[in-house]
Amino acid sequence: MAMLCAMLPAGAWAELELHMTNREQGNHTLTIFEAQEKADESAQKQDDEQSEVSQAAETANVQIETRFAQKKAEQLLSRAGASVQQSGELFTSGNLASMTLVWNGTQADGANGSSTIGLVLDLTTGEAVELARLFDDADAAFAAMENIISDDVLSELSDYMEYGDLLPMPTDNYAIDEQGLTVF
């Protein structure tokens, strides 16, 4: 199990932990992400601070479930003929946590295929971080990335891919890691 932590804002006496667990069941592999409050053994938390931290963990878990359909993936395991193979990555930088899930086999909608799903969370609030928030001038950054796609990527696409899938550049499915930004 991988476990990463990030400090909450000054004044809070707790940390939010993000866990990633890979669980094998028969020939299936599930990746489960979960946020929770880190136990604070050094001091008794005040009620308002406890509530703030618990709310951040709850918000993060709602974002995780909404994005990754973890409960649906578990339900698929009992369906005859379903095959689920997942692998995940977890990365933190400052108060951001980035999760990536590669899902092969039976998808949440029941279709067979492969998908890559990313989610970046603010560990102080548990909220999803929109891609535009990572840039001082999001419009200029997106335009520069779309120029790279137009100039360098489109000519390399195989025939089965649609150009429309890349431009305009999707901004709702991305992840960050030590290499930088990946848009899916």
Model-derived features: positions:
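Compositionally biased intrinsically disordered regions enriched in Thr/Gly
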Residues: 13-184
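Sec-dependent N-terminal signal peptides of Gram-positive bacterial secreted proteins and lipoproteins
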Residues: 1-14
